[in-house]
Structure formats: C-alpha cells, structure tokens
Regions:
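Catalytic machinery of carbohydrate-active enzymes
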Residues: 1-153
Length: 153
C-alpha cells in the first residue's frame, strides 16, 4: 500500500514539473557487462538532443566503474536498485534528483524492465517525451507493465 502511495506522489510531482525542458535521460538497468555494451550505443541516443543539451545515463551503482567508457558529455547517475525498491525515502530522493534534471526526453533502454524501478524513474522525470522498448513477457510484472504503457509517448 505504501509503495502505491509513494508512486502516486512521485507521479503527481512529475506532472507539476517546470516548463522549459531540455536534455536526455536514459535508464540502462543492466549489469556491468550490459553497461559496457551500452557504451557502444549511447552515441545513437545522444543524437536525439542538441549539441548543448545535457545527457544523463542512470545505471546500477555497481556499473559506475565503467563510466570512463562513455563520452565525457554523459553524466552518470548510479542507483542502488534493491534499495530503490525497498526504501521509500531513497526512492523519493532519487526521483526528486531525476525530476530536477528537467529533461525533454526520457528513455528506458531495457527489454526486460522492472515496473517498480525503470518505469517509476522514467515517469518521475516528468519528461515531455517518454519512450521504452516493448517489454518481454514477464508473468510476474505483465499487469503492471501493461498499465504503465499509458505513461509512454
């Protein structure tokens, strides 16, 4: 019950974001190996925004060590996913930080995404455009993922 209230509060605050949005936020929830592979793809995402627009990549905390593989333009934010799921105060803190970025575009780059983490972070940005891959069938989360489709552009 508290998780739903927390998510509703995050969604409400995201909807009240400020007007002039710019930049890109990408959520890449894989492990270190996935982050290494994603470093080869980030340039394609960067082309979605202007040369002067900020680019932020959210990764699992343990993937911050491969940050040197990404262009200097990319700001990495590490998130402890287990703590994000279990600790409401931490979740609100992370979501407030993402909302403060005031991005134009937010993307969840994973085919296997968690509705309790990836979707919440993308929604929390209040971005004008929100994108995600169609999720792979996942019986445990199918219902929530289907409900969250309305959040995306």
């Amino acid at each position: 019950m508290f998780r739903r209230l927390n998510d509703a509060q995050i969604q409400y605050r995201a909807a009240r974001g400020s007007g002039d949005k710019r930049g890109l936020l990408v959520v890449s929830s894989g492990g270190i190996g996935d982050s290494i592979l994603f470093s080869l793809m980030i340039e394609r995402f960067i082309t979605l925004v202007g040369d002067d627009d900020p680019v932020t990549l959210v990764v699992r905390s343990e993937s911050l060590g491969v940050g040197f593989l990404f262009p200097s333009r990319v700001n990495l934010i590490g998130v402890d996913y287990r703590r994000f799921i279990r600790d409401g105060a931490y979740k609100r803190q992370v979501c407030a930080e993402l909302r403060a970025l005031n991005v134009q575009i937010a993307i969840s780059s994973d085919h296997l995404r968690l509705p309790t983490v990836d979707d919440v972070m993308v929604m929390a940005t209040g971005a004008a455009q929100k994108f995600a891959l169609r999720p792979r069938t996942w019986p445990k989360h199918d219902r929530a993922l289907a409900q969250h489709e309305a959040w995306y552009t």
